[in-house]
Amino acid sequence: MPATIAADQISYADLYARWEQGNWRATEIDFATDREQWDHEFSDIDRRSALWTYSLFFHGEDSVADNLSPFIDAAPREEQKYFLATQQVDEARHAVLFARFIREVAGAGADIGSSLEETQPKLTWGFRKVFERLDRMGDELRKDRSKP
């Protein structure tokens, strides 16, 4: 039976080491089967629904990747900064994965920027409000790191 570790016993250095050991590459995932299913098994409504969902995830991951740096800068300890930097890399990796899927499977966009632009109209009002607030929080923290 695996030993359990209490959350307060896990250090930021432990979290960083776990992150290093568990990496995967967004650029190496093969979407050939996904493309085949997209083209031949999904109905038009399935494709529209899936693209809407993937677009929300894509924009969310991109927004968090863009907005984590002030939180990293404001972290009080170096170990916290290093761990938070891993989270920023993970958000970027997730955005790259969704961008590739949207481009290679759904056929939207030619690169990350154009895929973001092409899927922008799919974002709902509520989604936009949440991530606009994240943008503002990042801007506020950039100006004053003492804000919680």
Protein language model annotation of sequence segments:
Residues 1-148:
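Non-heme di-metal
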